[in-house]
Amino acid sequence: MASFGWKRKVGERVSKQTVQQFEQDSEQADEDEVEREGVDWLHVIKRKREVLLEDCAAKSKRLKEEGALLAEQDRNWEALKKWDEAVQLTPEDAVLYEMKSQVLITLGEVFLAVQSAEMATRLRPIWWEAWQTLGRAQLSLGEVELAVRSFQVALHLHPSERPLWEEDLNWALKLRENQQSLREKASQVDEARRLLVEAPELKGDYDFESDEVIEACSAMADRQKQYEDLKKKAVVVDAHGEAKEMLVEGDDNPTSSSQSVLIKARGL
């Protein structure tokens, strides 16, 4: 009869030293595998990010070019839509903001045009064309002093650009002079009105049979005539940007032998 005994455990005959060596080798292999996997994952993530950025840049470039073609066809709103999509992909592209500003000026959205041009100058502060576009947007908004400064910055960055001298800056300086003329005109009218209402000749006590009354009445008549003459004249800007005084028929209708020389605004 065969004797009964406990079954030996697996590995019972393996020495403890062999087991410990095996466990150490196994742990080292696991650590090496984890390390290799970690490096691989970082590389994969970095590569995916690079590919994503490349895809965004390529798509943004395509949208930019499509928008430029639409703008050349006067399909300005469609062009803006393309560029807005491109901005979402490449928000630090100053050219997109500058192009948007040009189209917004054309559409009369001058406040948005100024904002877009300002963003372009912040992203690329040494790009003279961005400053030129900002100056034109500011002119359209009526900010003549700011426009003069923007054109001066553009000229400082690119002094050889003749259109900046001959068109943009000269026009802005003329507008500034015209604004000064308008302010002086308004000041003269206000002063004439004040002297008419607060005439010092009316504050004295006169003998109605004396010559002082006649002199006071004559002075009042002169003030009245001066005030009316000032009201009959308006300062307008001709096609060459020159400010001129012209007679007006009513309160708001200037008259001239050549109405065609008058302009309301310069197309920038």
Curated annotation (Swiss-Prot):
SMART domains: TPR. Keywords: Repeat, TPR repeat. TPR repeats lie at residues 60-93, 94-127, 128-161. It comes from the Eukaryota. Coiled coil: none annotated. Gene3D superfamilies: Tetratricopeptide repeat domain. InterPro entries: TPR-containing (IPR052658), TPR-like_helical_dom_sf (IPR011990), TPR_rpt (IPR019734). Residues 24-34 have a biased composition (Acidic residues). The keyword Amino-acid biosynthesis does not apply. Residues 14-34, 249-268 are annotated as: Disordered. PANTHER family: OSMOSIS RESPONSIVE FACTOR, TETRATRICOPEPTIDE REPEAT PROTEIN 33. This is Tetratricopeptide repeat protein 33. It comes from Danio rerio (Zebrafish).
